[in-house]
C-alpha cells in the first residue's frame, strides 16, 4: 500500500477534509487499540495512517493560514 499523496488531500473540500481527519483519527485509535491487545497483524498501517493524518492537518492549517493572511492583507490595504 503506497503512501498517500498530499495532492489528494488538497483536492478535498473543507467539509470533506474535516470528515476525513475525523475518520483517520478514529481508525488510528482502533489500530492502536489492536496493537495494545496484540491483535494487529499489519503494524505498517499505523505509520500510513499517521502520515495521512499529518498531511490532512497540514492542508487544514494551510487553508486557515491562507484565509487569515488574505484577511489581514485586505485590512492593511485599506
Swiss-Prot record:
Biased composition (Polar residues): 68-78
Residue span of region Disordered: 59-78
GO molecular function, one term: structural constituent of ribosome
Assigned keywords, A-Z: Ribonucleoprotein, Ribosomal protein
HAMAP family assigned to the protein according to its UniProt record, in alphabetical order: Ribosomal_uL29
Family the UniProt entry places it in: Belongs to the universal ribosomal protein uL29 family.
Entry protein name: Large ribosomal subunit protein uL29
Annotated source species: Synechococcus sp. (strain JA-3-3Ab) (Cyanobacteria bacterium Yellowstone A-Prime)
Record gene name: rpmC
